């Protein structure tokens, strides 16, 4: 599962994966001869969406529509209902999830970025006191930087590990908000992890998933952020678990998104809850809104969709929302320690 030599190449990905918007993408689209294209963009690229739409329309010669619903990740590609007349989709900013089937021909454009100078980035890490036995995790946009950056760290005396995750991850070292198995694969060989990318979303998720300090480095600004306080994150979630141990009526949340549907897990949790004397109700949704859970005669919820709903947005809901492992803690089937991240495989 680890790599002592550069092995950050992809698994056998299909030809509809492209690093950037450019001639190769346009050529593939023209060859597909679509009648209409739908484009999905993440929040960070919305400002550029209209220019991109015009460019694709001009290059390919067919109508293009933009999906305006918020995009929550690679698991959340446009459904048939969102653009029923589009026979091809373009998804920007994400790699495909290998074990999730798409509903129409879909072209994933990962929006790769070169990032900063590897030597300068390594110097920043060394100056920041990051431990020398280090695991690297990266957002898909900065995958091309991993190898030169890893070599620059090695020249400064770092022992660097890159892990290969499970079947949900397309690349070694890759991070998904629901899956950090690339880090878990090498956790026993490192003293800390460094996330290479922007924002706190992945560092926080990684801190939940591994019992190691998690630092983060913005490769665009060459800015090193201190280690996440994992203890505080875990204590906060344990407090939520403690407050619902006496709850007798539970809602079990199930997503209809193709990449988030864990109906078998929901039904299994329902059986285990009933065996422990709890009442349960399964609730199905596509995009979950806190208002959807208002006024219901339920004491708490367990969410089988994206684990980040509970971990990042739980405070916005009218009743506590737990991940499946937290739910099993609450009904007495699992101990509070060690904390278990809800990895979506």
Model-derived regions, located:
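Pyridoxal 5′-phosphate
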Residues: 2-4
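The feature marks the mature, well-folded catalytic cores of soluble enzymes
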Residues: 8-24, 29-210, 214-226, 230-238
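Cofactor-cradling patches in redox/metallo enzymes
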Residues: 41-52, 64, 258-266, 270, ...
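Redox- and metal-dependent alpha/beta enzyme cores, enriched for Fe-S-associated oxidoreductases
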Residues: 149-150, 201-280, 287-295
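Peripheral docking tails and interdomain loops at the edges
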Residues: 220-224, 229-231, 307-345
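Short glycine-rich anion-binding loops that position phosphate/pyrophosphate groups of nucleotides
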Residues: 94-97, 198-201, 257-258, 306-309, ...
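Short loop/edge segments at beta-strand edges and connector loops
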Residues: 68, 164, 284-286, 323-325
């Amino acid at each position: 599962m680890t790599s002592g030599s550069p092995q950050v190449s992809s698994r056998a990905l299909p030809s509809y994966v492209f690093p950037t918007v450019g001639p190769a993408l346009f050529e593939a689209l023209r060859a597909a001869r679509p009648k209409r294209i739908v484009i999905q963009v993440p929040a960070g690229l919305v400002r550029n969406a209209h220019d991109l739409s015009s460019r694709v329309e001009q290059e390919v010669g067919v109508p293009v529509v933009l999906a305006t619903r918020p995009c929550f990740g690679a698991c959340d590609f446009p459904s048939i209902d969102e653009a029923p007349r589009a026979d091809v989709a373009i998804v920007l900013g994400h790699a495909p999830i290998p074990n999730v089937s798409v509903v129409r021909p879909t072209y994933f454009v990962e929006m790769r970025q070169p990032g900063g100078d590897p030597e300068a980035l390594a110097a920043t890490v060394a100056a920041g006191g990051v431990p020398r036995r280090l695991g690297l995790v990266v957002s898909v946009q900065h995958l091309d930087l991993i190898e030169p950056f890893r070599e620059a760290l090695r020249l400064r005396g770092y022992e660097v590990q890159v892990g290969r995750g499970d079947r949900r991850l397309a690349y070694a070292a890759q991070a998904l908000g629901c899956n950090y198995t690339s880090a878990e694969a090498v956790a026993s060989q490192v003293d800390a992890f460094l996330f290479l990318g922007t924002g706190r979303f992945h560092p926080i998720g990684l801190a939940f998933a591994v019992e190691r300090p998690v630092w983060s480095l913005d490769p665009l600004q060459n800015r090193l952020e201190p280690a996440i306080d994992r203890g505080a994150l875990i204590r906060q979630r344990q407090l939520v678990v403690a407050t619902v141990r006496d709850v007798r009526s539970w809602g079990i949340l199930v997503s209809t998104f193709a990449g988030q549907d864990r109906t078998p897990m929901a039904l299994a949790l329902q059986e285990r809850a009933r065996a422990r004397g709890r009442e349960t109700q399964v609730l199905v949704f596509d995009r979950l809104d806190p208002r959807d859970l208002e006024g219901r005669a339920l004491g708490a919820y367990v969410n089988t969709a994206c684990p980040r709903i509970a971990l990042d947005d739980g405070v916005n809901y009218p009743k506590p929302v737990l991940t499946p492992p937290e739910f099993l803690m609450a009904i007495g089937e699992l101990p509070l320690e060690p904390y278990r991240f809800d990895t979506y495989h």
